[in-house]
């Protein structure tokens, strides 16, 4: 039994939600998002909340139940408040800057790395060692942050590279003589 799936998702103030068959649409101040729910899950909009139930008691239906509820909650939060991921850059000479819409990264390569964000994603650089990725779709925001981090992930000896804000890097001891 899914403990997450049992709770209906309340529709926040300022957000209009619509359920059309298996498609949940949310429209809010930040934009509009759609989510197609798996066929094993039944979705209903009743008195200001979206209820999610499994169609049958199969293992597949129960496994999709809680995930579908969380995805719906994420699109409702996204169109109201949006999501953001913060990245930090550590290392001598490692820095980030915006060049038009593109993110320019100096990460110790022989060339600068240029990253063009997908539509709906905003990248800002408050400091040369800090990157903020924001948007309304939680999955896309996390994917963009992961792609930027992948260019130069943090290494365990000195901690140089791109890491998520608040991420702790397990440090290793160097060679001993």
From Swiss-Prot:
Q: Which domain of life is it from?
A: Bacteria
User: Which residue positions does the secretion signal occupy?
Assistant: none
Q: Name one GO cellular component term.
A: cytosolic large ribosomal subunit
Q: Name one Pfam family in it.
A: Ribosomal_L6
Please give the biological process terms from Gene Ontology that the record holds: cytoplasmic translation
Which keywords belong to this entry? Ribonucleoprotein, Ribosomal protein, RNA-binding, rRNA-binding
Record PANTHER family: 60S/50S RIBOSOMAL PROTEIN L6/L9, LARGE RIBOSOMAL SUBUNIT PROTEIN UL6M
Q: What is this protein called?
A: Large ribosomal subunit protein uL6
